[in-house]
């Protein structure tokens, strides 16, 4: 496995910037764009071992790269279905789980906003069409909410 799971997250209080963009403290170090359209159906909860955010959406919707990087894994896993893992600058890694289809392959360099997959409902742990989105830094899980740029 690429990562160790640790029951700790980074919880930063939200701040608000101009132009109705929600800004959190983590954004200053590594700002991420929302990886798909939809609504958060389940938040980050390290105590319950839910190490990401679930964004419910329509099957087949575009899943976007949250930041520039390199695809280090694009394939199938039993629990997560079609999974893509992207390595970014400064030790950050993002994971995109339960996709219907993957549009990029391992080794591909990608840019923030590139369509990398289609939202789906694959894998044993999926409970409906959604994207499970995770953020890691140097092998430690972080709460993506603290890094996501979201319009209000």
Go through each PLM region and give its residues.
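Surface-exposed, glycine-biased beta-strand/turn segments
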Residues: 3-80
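Short, surface-exposed secondary-structure edge patches
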Residues: 60-63, 101-102, 106-108
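Zn2+-dependent peptidoglycan hydrolase active-site motif and core
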Residues: 66-103, 129
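Solvent-exposed coil/turn segments that connect beta secondary-structure elements
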Residues: 45-47, 58-60, 68, 76-77, ...
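Short, acidic/hydrophobic/Gly-rich beta-strand patch recurrent on exposed beta strands
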Residues: 53-56, 83-88, 132-134
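Conserved, short, structured surface segments that act as functional micro-motifs
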Residues: 106-152
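Residue-level recognition of beta-strand microenvironments
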Residues: 43, 74-75, 99-102, 119-122, ...
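Conserved beta-strand positions that form and line the central face of beta-propeller blades
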Residues: 54, 85, 95, 118, ...
């Amino acid at each position: 496995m690429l990562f160790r799971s640790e029951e700790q997250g980074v919880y930063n209080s939200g701040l608000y910037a101009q132009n109705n963009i929600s800004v959190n403290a983590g954004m200053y170090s590594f700002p991420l764009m929302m990886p798909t359209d939809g609504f958060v159906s389940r938040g980050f909860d390290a105590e319950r071992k839910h190490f990401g955010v679930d964004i419910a959406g329509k099957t087949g919707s575009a899943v976007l790269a949250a930041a520039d990087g390199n695809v280090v894994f694009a394939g199938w896993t039993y629990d997560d279905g079609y999974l893509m893992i992207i390595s970014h600058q400064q030790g950050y890694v993002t994971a995109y789980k339960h996709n219907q289809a993957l549009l990029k392959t391992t080794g591909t360099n990608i840019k923030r906003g590139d369509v990398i997959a289609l939202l789906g409902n694959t894998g044993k742990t999926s409970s409906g069409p959604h994207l499970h989105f995770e953020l890691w830094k140097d092998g430690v899980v972080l709460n993506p909410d603290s890094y996501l740029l979201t319009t209000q």
